[in-house]
Amino acid sequence: MSVEIALDGSKMRPDIWKKLSVEDNYYLDSGFYFYQQLLRHDGMMLHASAVVVDGYAYLFSGPCGMGKSTHTAMYKKTFPDAVIINDDKPALRRIDGIWYVFGTPWCGKDGINVNTSAPLGGICFLHRGDTLLRRLTALEALPQFLRQTYGRDTAQDAKLLMSLLDDLLRNIPVFEFFNHAVPGDEQITYQAMREAIGRKEKTL
């Protein structure tokens, strides 16, 4: 996949982001253009923090303030080989029937990003609340995805996105985790998603 982004200012929308600097406008507009093109290459963006452990990428998504970065930071502390490859907007792509996660330059205020990729192991939507983890059905997961991705600006984009989500939800385990962002939470999500991968591997 190759996408050329010409930062000539032609797509800038200062009327929408009036309080942002020129550089921030470029950052946002180039990101939106990339996400749109990604849909045309069997991929999508997800608002999430992505961490790689034991060769698989795990994504933690949800609204701002739900502790996505906090959760992946706990992975870094607990698992020696953990690498956060993107802390805000990783790219997901289906290549030869397998889903992969890629780092992108659109990585949030802390700039945490690694230009690498890994097979997608699982996705978990975070919420505040007493500790509860459960696997979601495709019907339950879909609304949460739609709130945290791009792809509904045009009918064509929406069609591409829904086709990709249909495949992803059939093949990737998706969970939701209510928590208070305390040490040990990372063990709960890791064990659940790793077990789901193990069950899938046994069927292949």
Protein language model regions, located:
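Charged, amphipathic alpha-helical linker segments immediately N-terminal to NTP-binding catalytic cores
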Residues: 1-35, 193-202
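Ordered hydrophobic segments in well-structured contexts
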Residues: 4-6, 45, 174-176
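P-loop NTPase catalytic core of nucleic-acid-dependent motor ATPases
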Residues: 18-57, 61
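Glycine-rich, often acidic-flanked micro-motifs
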Residues: 49, 53-63, 77-204
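Conserved lysine of the Walker
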Residues: 68
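Post-Walker A alpha-helix
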Residues: 71-72
